[in-house]
């Protein structure tokens, strides 16, 4: 049974009649690319695309970047095109 004190912050879980455990909920942030005045996803903008690529050169998943599914697909396609056109490296060198 979950009892919610503050729906977005904490909840108390009661397991039988034993001890109560606190369960913390984090409110999911909105998509940073869906807000007004957000930058346009374009393969010619490597400064934006590099923010969504890991240190090793892999594309970061949407659960880490908080990007919605529609924008994540556009990002992935833009990163792939930028790599083919040599605007982004396929693999980043270890420093």
From Swiss-Prot:
<dbReference type="Pfam" id="PF01084">
    <property type="entry name" value="Ribosomal_S18"/>
</dbReference>
<comment type="similarity">
    <text>Belongs to the bacterial ribosomal protein bS18 family.</text>
</comment>
<keyword id="KW-0694">RNA-binding</keyword>
<dbReference type="InterPro" id="IPR001648">
    <property type="entry name" value="Ribosomal_bS18"/>
</dbReference>
<comment type="subunit">
    <text>Part of the 30S ribosomal subunit. Forms a tight heterodimer with protein bS6.</text>
</comment>
<dbReference type="GO" id="GO:0022627">
    <property type="term" value="C:cytosolic small ribosomal subunit"/>
</dbReference>
<keyword id="KW-0699">rRNA-binding</keyword>
<dbReference type="InterPro" id="IPR036870">
    <property type="entry name" value="Ribosomal_bS18_sf"/>
</dbReference>
<dbReference type="InterPro" id="IPR018275">
    <property type="entry name" value="Ribosomal_bS18_CS"/>
</dbReference>
<protein>
    <recommendedName>
        <fullName>Small ribosomal subunit protein bS18</fullName>
    </recommendedName>
</protein>
<dbReference type="GO" id="GO:0003735">
    <property type="term" value="F:structural constituent of ribosome"/>
</dbReference>
<dbReference type="GO" id="GO:0006412">
    <property type="term" value="P:translation"/>
</dbReference>
<keyword id="KW-0687">Ribonucleoprotein</keyword>
<comment type="function">
    <text>Binds as a heterodimer with protein bS6 to the central domain of the 16S rRNA, where it helps stabilize the platform of the 30S subunit.</text>
</comment>
<keyword id="KW-0689">Ribosomal protein</keyword>
<dbReference type="GO" id="GO:0070181">
    <property type="term" value="F:small ribosomal subunit rRNA binding"/>
</dbReference>
